[in-house]
A protein has these predicted regions:
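A short, hydrophobic C-terminal helix/tail in secreted or cell-surface proteins
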Residues: 245-249
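An acidic/histidine-cluster motif and surrounding catalytic segment
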Residues: 1-98, 102-244
Length: 249
């Protein structure tokens, strides 16, 4: 493996909590190797809920959410589990939540460091989405999140917003998803829509790993967004860390 000369850009990143299913050890290995390559040690694995063969009704409080697959339920509850675990076991002001298909390769193209990024975050943020799958024009400046900025592959969340999500959607060791999240209680809508959420695509996602929830989306949506962002970063490498509603493609 080649020597990574860009590790300094991610110095002081963390704490990271990455979600991984027990039934996907190959993804755990991928993440552990990724962190080692980038010299990241401030991370912890969170065992996710697997909705592929179980409807997960036993971990829900209240009605089963409408128009959601068991895979989507597993994704949402796994994120709530990770957020709750961080909130209750750490006193850090924020956490970085990752799924086990995150891709850090474009960090090589950054013209800034993680510390630079943290220093320029908006004063009023609750969540900042750091990986984006978009069905429309891509926005590469830090912007208020658009409705078609999809993906919970990676985001940073503060304690205030974590407390709100736990209060609304966690009941002991169970989860409540029937309390009016619009349009559905999928992870994107539940986490992002209930707070002041910004977005900027400074990380990617490993399309080669596919999708455990929506495999049909990989070719239809994920690859086009991935390719567009990869091309932009490799050709420009400049991320404008101020808020903007203008499209930069």
């Amino acid at each position: 493996m080649d020597k990574n000369k860009s590790t300094f850009k991610l110095k002081n990143i963390g704490p990271i909590y990455y979600i991984n299913l027990d039934g996907q050890p190959e993804r755990k290995e991928y993440m552990e190797d990724l962190f080692k390559y980038w010299e990241i040690d401030n991370y912890e694995r969170v065992s996710g809920y697997d909705g592929r063969d179980d409807d997960l009704s036993d971990i829900l409080k209240g009605r089963y959410p409408e128009q959601m697959t068991s895979g989507e339920v597993g994704c949402t509850t796994s994120h709530l589990k990770a957020i709750k675990h961080w909130y209750e076991t750490s006193d850090t002001p924020y956490a970085i939540i990752m799924e086990d298909d995150i891709d850090l390769d474009i960090v090589r193209c950054w013209n800034f460091t993680w510390s630079n990024f943290i220093a320029k975050m908006p004063y009023d943020w609750d969540v900042i989405q750091l990986a984006i799958i978009c069905t429309g024009g891509l926005h590469v400046t830090l912007h208020k999140r658009f409705v078609n900025d999809f993906s919970t592959a990676c985001y940073i969340i503060n304690r205030h917003h974590a407390e709100k999500l736990i209060r609304l959607h966690v009941r002991g060791d169970k989860y409540k998803l029937d309390n009016g999240v619009k349009p559905r209680a999928v992870a994107d809508d539940l986490i992002y829509n209930s707070g002041n959420t910004y977005a900027v695509p400074i990380f990617l996602y490993k399309v080669q790993l596919g999708s455990s929830i929506h495999p049909e989306h990989v070719d239809a949506i994920h690859k086009a967004s991935y390719n567009a962002l990869t091309n932009w970063w490799t050709q420009s490498g400049i991320c404008l860390l101020y808020t903007s509603d203008a499209a930069d493609e």
